[in-house]
Amino acid sequence: MSLESLFQHIIFTEHQAEESRRLMREVRSEITRCREKIKKATEELNEEKIKLESKVQQFFEKSFFLQLLKAHENALEKQYSEITNHRNMLLQTFEAIKKQMIEEEDKFIKEITDFNNDYEITKKRELLMKENVKIEISDLENQANMLKSEMKSMEHDSSQLNELQKQKSELIQELFTLQRKLKVFEDEENESICTTKYLEAEKIKISEKPQNDTECLRLKKELELYKEDDMESVYEALQTEIEFLELTLAQKDLQESK
């Protein structure tokens, strides 16, 4: 081998060695990058694992909470069913008590009405209550007018105005209530008037009974005869006797009707 060939071989060998060292550096650099990637991937994996474990824990907690909610929902449904049944029982009891109270109230009102009719105090009480209601209505109207005047003079004060308006509304409501009561009393008064008219008709009927009496008819016939004969004095005497007889019979019929 010549010296030149040896020199070229040495240069080629050094070149290969340099190439090998370059490749080694690239391999080491690549290994370092791969290790960094592996480390980063491992860290990310650990983070994801921690997140996953946290999510799993949250899932178990939510599952447990959901079971608790379902158990609570079942308990509430059971309680609602019990409350509904109890409410239905209470409603039935209330309806029965309400019906009994209405019956007792009707019975009491009937007894009071019978008592008032027996002792003739209903009409007096109604008249007195009617007068009282009218007086109260008049007082309330006066108070309402006074409040209206006060409200006009106190419009600058909002709080006082609102209070007066509230009082006015209450007074108007009470006035409507009393007017309804007055209407009830007027209806009762009309009923009493109808009863009075009926009694007056009975009285007229009783007063007409003497027309069917034999003695009364006889005297009337005599009266007609005397009237035809222009016997005025006898006619007047018989007329007086007939009126006295009618009055006596009417009083007798009234005593019998009592």
Swiss-Prot record:
Q: Does Metal-binding show up as a keyword for this record?
A: no
Q: Where in the cell is it found?
A: Cytoplasm; Cell projection, Cilium
Q: PANTHER family annotated for this entry?
A: COILED-COIL DOMAIN-CONTAINING PROTEIN 172 (PTHR22419:SF2)
The record's gene field reads: CCDC172
Q: Does the keyword Transmembrane apply?
A: no
Similarity comment: family membership: Belongs to the CCDC172 family.
Please give the coiled-coil regions recorded for this protein.
13-90, 123-191, 226-256
Q: Which organism is it from?
A: Homo sapiens (Human)
How is this protein organized at the quaternary level? May interact with TEKT2.
Keywords from UniProt, A to Z, are:
Cell projection, Coiled coil, Cytoplasm
**Predominant cellular place of this UniProt entry's protein:** cytoplasm
A Gene Ontology term for the protein's cellular component: sperm midpiece
Name the record gives this protein: Coiled-coil domain-containing protein 172
